[in-house]
A protein has these predicted regions:
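Soluble cytosolic regulatory domains appended to membrane proteins
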Residues: 1-3, 15-36, 40-67
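Short helix-loop-beta connector
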Residues: 2, 131-134
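Short glycine/proline-centered loop/turn elements that form peptide/ligand docking sites
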Residues: 5-6, 15, 78-79, 123-130
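The conserved cystathionine-beta-synthase
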Residues: 8-27, 33, 52, 56, ...
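Short beta->alpha transition motifs characteristic of CBS
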Residues: 24, 31, 38-54, 99, ...
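Conserved ATP-binding/catalytic motifs of P-loop helicase motor domains
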Residues: 71-74, 148
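N-terminal Rossmann NAD(P)H-binding glycine-rich loop of SDR-like oxidoreductase domains
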Residues: 140-155
Length: 156
């Protein structure tokens, strides 16, 4: 996953926009965030499908189908606290025995720092870091080849 743009949408993004991001990130989910990147909710491809079947148009806002209380974890949690909150029964409740639950890991400001997948046994099977896009880069002379390559990577 290149950056958080593939896993987050604003509440006003359209259902079509959300489906496009879900198609790219292949998690089956996007997370709804406010203007400060704080988590507001989550939308799965199933939420969108059910919304369309209920008569929603793909041009409607994603907030109309978003779940406002998704399962989350915090980066400050240790393994014991994680295991107390993300139990196999919680995972199975959301995705059954054979599925994986995609969970945003939040910082203390409720911003997504990574996304993990947990299986029906409650075991973490993958983690993807969420890299914030760079808004400003200050380059001071003498960066050399390596510095210029790093800047290109940051700005790319």
């Amino acid at each position: 996953m290149e950056n958080d743009a593939e896993v987050t949408v604003s509440p006003e993004a359209t259902l079509k926009d959300a489906m496009g991001k879900i198609n790219v990130n292949r998690f089956g989910i996007v997370f709804v965030v406010d203007e400060d990147d704080r988590l507001l909710g989550a939308v799965t491809d199933g939420d969108i499908r059910r919304g369309i079947l209920d008569g929603k148009k793909v041009t409607e806002a994603v907030r109309t189908v978003a779940t406002t209380d998704p399962v989350t974890a915090y980066e400050s949690w240790g393994e014991q606290k994680f295991n107390q909150h993300i139990t196999p029964s919680i995972v199975r409740h959301h995705v059954g025995h054979d599925g994986t639950l995609t969970i945003p890991v939040l910082n203390d400001d409720d911003q997504i720092v990574s996304v993990i997948n947990v299986d029906g046994k409650g075991e973490q099977v993958s983690e993807q870091m969420v890299r914030k896009s760079v808004e400003t880069v200050l380059v001071i002379g003498g960066a050399g080849y390596l510095g210029s390559q790093l800047c290109r990577e940051l700005l790319g």
